[in-house]
Design a protein with these regions (language model features):
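Sec/Tat signal peptide C-region and signal peptidase I cleavage site
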Residues: 17-21
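Alpha-helical linker/edge segments of TPR/alpha-solenoid repeat scaffolds
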Residues: 476-491
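Bacterial N-terminal signal peptides
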Residues: 5-15
């Protein structure tokens, strides 16, 4: 009897904090849909029921069905009605200032779930008189009033909100969950449940909720460009930092630091995390008919127009990534300029800390009232299970969990874990352990040990896709060790090199963006640096 009582108390200790957190998140969420789109209304009800969001917090708006709207439509049919409801229902507490304006000083709402059918972006309107630009901000930024609907909603409760240029994001780089923050009561965190089809949106919702129970497990793939100087180095710095964060967290990671994106013949398996740049449309292995991300996956490709439309499975990146099974991504609806795209290392770091997708997404944005969108369930916490105690006897066998445990027990450095990695490989017969070690060794320029790890992994690999990838990795490391022996190796047998692509006709969408406008000023703007 005592054991039963003790077990029940342990269950309560684990369950109650999680349940309370879910209730708080649901109570702080509004679900917004397009009343003129039947699927939008149905998806709103579906999501609210899955997340236990009160029916009174599901709100329809009389809107066009197009993804792009005008500034006038945004103000009259979205911003003004939403602001009125927030105040009338007591979700925002406002104070009248001497100049006749109002200021939000307390809030009950922090999250907005925008359902498929809700407009995505606001077109530029040259007739709008713009306010004077902030000091140091050039006209390329301050002279624009196009924006994502989501980013405008994030900013509309702030005292310095104006329909032109960008606003420094008061939540950028923060660590604290928004419900524990005193920062800017008028700040809202929108996230968009949107995809090429309504069925894909339901899958995003279901996969997110299911993944939270055990956590997001699988491989991480990071695709850099080998940039070491110039205006675009910041993007590659994010990729390199991402690799460090992922490996220290115990996630097996493959880092492609060649100028091209992943080649089409590169096998990607068990993909839970993907970050890459810089191509206009989805390409490489993601085009394969049979490719799918793991349920709940987080996948982001950095590109200026990655979220220009979410209704197409073949163009841009955000829509196609969701169509391939990802549950969460980030994007831009118009040109944002590199410093005002999401800081991807901040994004992944905050997700790993256990905050929601919406929180991590907006923590990673230097600016709001700009071009960014967060796509996925705003309340999705892919790693919340990692940060909770659970009875190991109830866990399913999971080699990725064991890999994380080994890494964390080795001072978060997989290079110090060779013995336990080999022990896990012998006990499980799983090649993942040695392949992940080999990739870390390769990136640290420990080439002979990396070659040994890949060769040993190949001996036990059972999946043909994994075998093919290991053969590519072996060839790549061998070429680095003895380049003179591999001069005649065709690019199909190893990773493609820059010299190979220079002899072929290059797809314009894969080329670096033209640097017609000097970007030096972007590096000196008054926004916090990492």
């Amino acid at each position: 009897m005592f054991k039963l009582a003790a077990g029940f108390l342990v269950f309560l200790a684990l369950w109650v904090p999680t349940a309370l957190a879910k209730d708080r998140l649901a109570s702080a969420t509004l679900v917004l849909f397009n009343s003129n789109d039947a699927e939008s209304a149905e998806l709103a009800r579906y999501y609210a029921s899955k997340r236990s969001i009160p029916a009174a917090q599901v709100i329809g708006f009389d809107l066009p069905v197009a993804e792009q709207i005008t500034r006038e439509v945004f103000n009259r049919q979205i911003a003004d009605p939403l602001r009125n409801q927030l105040i009338e229902k007591g979700w925002w507490l406002v104070r009248l200032l001497p100049d006749g304006t109002t200021r939000v000083f307390d809030t009950r709402i922090r999250f907005l779930a925008l359902m498929r059918g809700f407009p995505l972006k606001i077109s530029s309107d040259p007739s709008i008189e713009l306010p004077p630009p902030m000091e140091g901000i050039p006209p390329e930024v301050s002279g624009r009033n196009d924006a994502s609907v989501d980013s405008e909603l994030a900013a509309m409760g702030l005292p310095d909100f104006v329909p032109g240029g960008l606003i420094p994001n008061p939540y950028f780089g923060r660590f604290t969950p928004i419900l524990e923050e005193s920062v800017s009561p008028g700040l809202l965190l929108p996230s968009r449940l949107d995809a090429p089809t309504a069925a894909m949106v339901r899958k995003m919702i279901d996969d997110s909720i299911a993944t939270e129970k055990e956590g997001l497990w699988g491989w991480a793939y990071v695709d850099g460009r080998d940039i070491s100087s110039g205006a675009y180095i910041e993007g590659d710095n994010w990729m390199r930092k991402l690799v460090e964060i992922l490996r220290q967290s115990g996630i097996p990671t493959i880092f492609d630091n060649l100028p091209e994106t992943f080649q089409e013949n590169f096998p990607i398996t068990d993909a839970a995390v993907y970050f890459g740049w810089y191509a206009g449309d989805i390409n490489g292995p993601f085009l394969r008919e049979d490719f799918r991300f793991r349920p709940g996956a987080v996948a982001v490709h950095l590109h200026s127009f990655s979220a220009s439309s979410l209704r197409n499975s073949a163009n841009h990146w955000c829509g196609p990534l969701i169509a391939k099974g990802a549950a969460a991504t980030l994007g831009n609806v118009y040109e944002p300029y590199l410093p005002f795209t999401p800081n991807l290392d901040v994004f992944q770091d905050r997700l790993l800390a256990g905050v929601t997708l919406a929180e991590a997404g907006w923590m990673s944005q230097r600016a709001i009232s700009w071009m960014g969108v967060v796509i996925g369930d705003p309340l999705y916490r892919p790693y919340q299970a990692w940060n909770q105690f659970s009875d190991p006897r109830s866990r399913q066998e999971n080699p990725f969990r064991r890999f994380r445990s080994i890494t964390r027990s080795s001072r978060s450095n997989i290079l110090l874990a060779m013995l336990p990695i080999h022990e896990a490989t012998m006990e499980t017969g799983n090649s993942m352990f040695l392949e992940a070690l080999g990739n870390a060794q390769m990136d640290a320029d420990h080439l002979p040990p990396a070659l040994d790890s890949f060769r040993e992994a190949l001996k036990i690999a059972k999946d043909p896709e994994v075998q093919a990838r290991l053969e590519l990795e072996i060839a790549f490391v061998s070429r680095r060790i003895s380049p003179e022996e591999f001069q005649e190796v065709s690019p199909e047998e190893t990773f493609a090199e820059e010299s190979d692509t220079q002899e072929k006709e290059v797809d314009p969408s894969l080329q670096k963006p033209k640097e017609e406008t000097p970007l030096d000023w972007l590096l000196n703007l008054p926004y916090p640096d990492l």
